[in-house]
Curated annotation (Swiss-Prot):
GO cellular component, one term: plasma membrane
Localization (cell): Cell membrane
Positions of disulphide bridges: none
Organism (species): Acinetobacter baylyi (strain ATCC 33305 / BD413 / ADP1)
Protein name (database record): Phosphatidylserine decarboxylase proenzyme
Broad class of where this protein is predominantly found: membrane
GO molecular-function terms, A-Z: phosphatidylserine decarboxylase activity
Pfam assignment, any one: PS_Dcarbxylase
Gene that this polypeptide is encoded by: psd
Post-translational modification: Is synthesized initially as an inactive proenzyme. Formation of the active enzyme involves a self-maturation process in which the active site pyruvoyl group is generated from an internal serine residue via an autocatalytic post-translational modification. Two non-identical subunits are generated from the proenzyme in this reaction, and the pyruvate is formed at the N-terminus of the alpha chain, which is derived from the carboxyl end of the proenzyme.
Pathway this chain belongs to: Phospholipid metabolism; phosphatidylethanolamine biosynthesis; phosphatidylethanolamine from CDP-diacylglycerol: step 2/2
Length: 285
């Protein structure tokens, strides 16, 4: 890495610690929610151009018909654009994006990036709720700004708990993952816990810099309170059902218990995936 590249990287990391993360996200959130015709049209067009958004696969292909940038960003896709793998026991990608990492959780530590890991107990936010996953399996899917930003069920399960965990709002791209210790266990997140045929399953929606909100189909849009919020539920969702959505991008982490499933060998760090694509398989007979 050249001196200039290293300097840019170091400045990028340092800047994230210096900026008022939550205040910035609130300001961005206000703009994203605006239904002012001029504001939302300008923001949508600029975003669409910068990231090359393909609206031909969206349920609403006309950018001008979205009420706000948030509605545009969390747009639904046309029916049939994403096909959920229907094989018995298959585990599917919860979102469009890139696999940041996947594999085995060793002694309660989840691999984040070269030289970095984080505690599954800190990620989940509760020692008892984290216990089933300490030697289990994980996959981390990063949703870039250009991706479809709804998160779906990787496997059929009954939602038993949601735990909102306040935290920081670092960017979650590869540069940050390689340089911020315990990144995903430090950022604001919503932990969703399920009972499944494979035992316990977790889907963790991790917030990031300028993310204007996290929403689930059960809790609605999460309103940051600055404190842990544990809620109990009894809602069954099928594989491929929508679970939640991000307002301005981030990361979804899925966790399974030990010896309950295996990942398909074709997938590795930086593999591109789409929602519904098979990622792994149950080891249950």
């Amino acid at each position: 890495m050249s001196f200039t590249s290293r300097l840019k990287k170091d400045l990028f990391i340092k800047a994230q610690s210096l900026v008022p993360q939550h205040q910035l996200s609130r300001v961005v959130g206000k703009v994203a929610e605006s239904e002012n015709i001029l504001i939302k049209a300008a923001v949508i067009q600029a975003f669409k151009t910068k990231y090359g958004i393909d609206l031909s696969i969206a349920e609403q292909a006309d950018a001008l018909k979205y009420k706000s940038f948030n509605e545009f960003f969390t747009r639904a896709l046309k029916e049939g654009v994403r096909v959920v793998d229907s094989a018995t026991g298959s585990i599917v990608s919860p979102a469009d994006g890139a696999i940041s990492q996947l594999g085995t959780i060793h002694d309660g530590e989840v691999f984040q990036a070269k030289g970095q890991s984080f505690s599954v107990e800190k990620l989940i936010g509760d020692p008892q709720l984290a216990q089933p996953f300490k030697q289990g399996q994980f996959a981390t899917v990063y949703l870039s700004p250009r991706d479809y930003h709804r998160v779906h069920m990787p496997f059929t399960g009954t939602l038993t708990e949601t735990l909102y965990i306040p935290g920081e709002l670092f960017s979650v791209n590869q540069v940050t993952a390689e340089n911020i210790p315990g990144l995903f266990a430090r950022n604001e997140r919503m932990v969703c816990l399920f009972d499944t045929e494979l035992g316990r399953m977790a889907v963790v929606l991790v917030g990031a810099m300028i993310v204007a909100g996290i929403e689930t189909v059960v809790t609605g849009k999460v309103k940051p309170t600055g404190r842990l919020e544990l809620n109990h539920h009894d809602v069954t969702l099928q594989k491929g059902d929508e679970l939640g959505r991000f307002y301005l991008g981030s990361t979804a982490i899925i966790l399974f218990e030990k010896d309950k499933m295996v990942w398909d060998q074709q997938f590795k760090a930086n593999s591109i995936v789409v929602m519904g694509e098979k990622l792994g398989q149950s080891t249950n007979p």
